Amino acid sequence: MFTLHISAKAQTENLTVITNTKGAPEELKFSDLRSILMGEKQRWRNGNKIMIALMKTNTAAGNSICKKIYDMSSDELKKFWLALVFDGKSDGPVFLNSAAEVQSYVAENPGAIGVTDQQQEINDTHIVLIDGKKAF
């Protein structure tokens, strides 16, 4: 059982940020990424609206996103976003079932940013370096 826990943790340790090729920079500091994903920054420099795509919090990658980026539990993250949306401060993220769905959403929406557990680029997306690294 201990071995399985380590294996599952190793699979979700590395997260990758992808963006649509229209609007987003090719590199971000982790602090800037966190600001974007907290809804504090709403537009890219070119004026495109930032749209956030995340893995559902009941997935291993989604749980890792909650901990590594937001420093929250999945329930805390849901409450955080409900409050922001209710107060009209930000549009909430789109929560998707798989890395493939996140990649498709990001590819189809200029200004979109997504976090997945896979280092893969598809048409109209690119991997954003976070503090100079492809994965964190």
PLM features per residue range, with description:
Residues M1-S7:
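C-terminal segment of classical bacterial N-terminal signal peptides
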